[in-house]
A protein has these predicted regions:
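N-terminal ligand-binding lobe of clamshell/alpha-beta domains
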Residues: 20-204
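Bacterial N-terminal signal peptides that target proteins for export
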Residues: 1-10
Length: 204
């Protein structure tokens, strides 16, 4: 099972909890080791990689799309099974601006800015293109905080810290920790089972 499938499964299976109030401003270190301050609770979020909606589904379980104003709808393009699950549960997802934000930085930035975003969540792998295209500089000039998460370049080291960071930014640290515990328990179970498997000699 991929990490993104695990996130979706957890979002749908974990029992709903009361959201804990966050305190803003909050300052975090993102997965690019940048210090980012978010001055208020994000209400208008851009997703550079639409698959990160699965993380929001863990943190904002009632409706992960409620605060998303623009995204690159990769689930629709690349994973129709996941997209159909998301669309059935949250039909409004199909109405959110699909900005077709590629890793090459291609995007109609003016249209995105017209949505008045107050946070962009981006994958670390896309940073070079965001810098080269000027997207990062433009958003920073408009005082729109950008945080980089990473589930692909260094998944072992950065996946859980990415979720913890977003939990803090979104005022959902308890839910982030809830998922991290859920993930760690299952990872420990796998390790325990593997430790009991007898090593067999290699046959050439």
């Amino acid at each position: 099972m991929t990490m993104k499938k695990a996130l979706l499964g957890a979002a749908l299976l974990l029992s709903p909890l009361l959201a804990m109030a966050g305190n803003w401003p909050v300052t975090v270190k993102d997965m690019d080791n940048r210090t980012v301050t978010v001055t208020q609770e994000p209400q208008r979020i851009i997703l550079q990689d639409g698959r990160d909606i699965l993380t929001l589904a863990v943190l904002e379980r009632d409706n992960p799309f409620a605060k998303v104003v623009a995204w690159n709808n990769l689930p629709k393009k690349q994973d129709t099974e996941t997209w159909n699950v998301l669309k059935r549960k949250w039909p409004e997802a199909d109405k959110i601006l699909d900005m077709k934000f590629s890793d090459q930085g291609n995007v109609d930035l003016e249209t995105v800015i017209s949505r008045h975003p107050d946070l962009m969540i981006a994958q670390l792998r896309a940073k070079p293109s965001l810098v080269q295209s000027g997207v990062l500089a433009k958003l920073e000039a408009l005082h729109v905080p950008v945080v980089f998460v990473d589930y692909e370049l260094h998944p072992v080291e950065n996946t859980m810290p990415s979720i913890a960071m977003l939990g803090k930014v979104l005022g959902q640290s308890d839910r982030a920790q809830d998922y991290i515990n859920f993930y760690q328990q299952r990872l420990d179970t796998i390790h325990q089972r593997l430790a009991k498997v007898e090593k067999k000699p290699l046959v050439f």
